[in-house]
């Protein structure tokens, strides 16, 4: 967790947990041969927050520990954020810690989380509707963050602090049950402890195993992504995994990679029940003929572009049209309602052709159709060639999005 010569930034609120962590790291820093710096952020949520800041600064002077402090008006940021006050405070705090660590040259950031914090987080996530891997929370070490106290209960830390006379301040809002975390701590956890007095240890074991499971799943997902996920201009496509759990995790990964967030697990499960599910701001997941598309709903503008050269590239397609006729002009456009094509003397709806050839629904408005001046469909790239397209006009589908044509090849007979 710590190596000789490292510089550790210690997150200190002034409460008993973080002050005890600062005390322990200061005490053992000569033995561990590490350098420590304290960091305190005033969230300006409470009137007494300035008192906490001054307390931390005073103790750090007494203990000869460098300290970095700052303040952020979290309530102002919270007003129009659409998030809870606790969520905003956490985001601001972690941002401050990362920036401060970089400023002072610290390679590690020490946090005072313990087993009770772990229990409260698990309960909170279960209430909100987490997936199974969502229980892999608060790891002992992740990126630059370390949590040396995660193996201890709150009661053990408090007992040690009393024995050593560690100074600290009390945050009066810790007892205000209007905050979700406090409600869990003071109302729900005591009931759980009536059923199992060592519930903190039980949850710690559960989370430890879930971390191992998450690591395995992350490796499996990464391997699948590297082999099967394709990103285009405004969407991604991948082969639909046979395993439903892998499907959910790959979908989560793609959503986070593209948009920086994921839906609640309950909403994500909805993709197993429906062919198409929309989340926030028009973001969708659509399943069709063994492929999955993830993107943002965009109402495609109808276009009609004259073919003037041999090569055209659009919507992930690359086509070649060699016009050997001086008496004909061609255009490409996307499909229209009621489009039909005549092949071998038989007229068929373009929609039926797409279904028969198992063209995923999310490609049907993207494929560039070759038409004549009468707007008749002459060629559906890789799918069908009309009787009206002269034989001396050369057409070829050179590139296309994954899954557009099955089997990795294309054919033009209907």
UniProtKB/Swiss-Prot annotation:
This is tRNA(Ile)-lysidine synthase. Its main location: cytoplasm. One of its GO terms (biological process) is tRNA modification. The keyword Cytoplasm applies. The N-terminal region contains the highly conserved SGGXDS motif, predicted to be a P-loop motif involved in ATP binding. Belongs to the tRNA(Ile)-lysidine synthase family. Keywords: ATP-binding, Cytoplasm, Ligase, Nucleotide-binding, tRNA processing. InterPro entries: Lysidine-tRNA-synth_C, Rossmann-like_a/b/a_fold, TilS/TtcA_N, tRNA_Ile_lys_synt, tRNA_Ile_lys_synt_N.
